[in-house]
């Protein structure tokens, strides 16, 4: 019996080693990526996609730094991501859980990101200070894509920043 919805289902494993992501995307800030992923989902003739992925990124070069130990587990559509991202890199620890929704004209964000350690200097994200480290808990529940149409709440709690001048504990924002 023919498939009148023209839906394609997929279920399998995808992996790559040292794929030049920068060359593939034209983004000069990106380099090579190595990953393995289990993916299960479907797509239709209108390029709508719905997939569950469980991925481990062993290497991701970005801004002349090689990130390691990234795990992604969640549901992805053409315009949304609901799930978790766990980063256990020596210079950046991150636990992300939540939803990013770009389905409407105004995007919607609802997530928590715990960053117990980030070293901006070693990640090449700060080139001014000789020391640049932070830790914080970031929660967001808002919609918007600029300052004028944003509505909701963003909180930064238990945050600290350290540079060559000392360590600064920040009040909850």
Residue ranges and their predicted role:
Residues 1-173:
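Interface amphipathic segments
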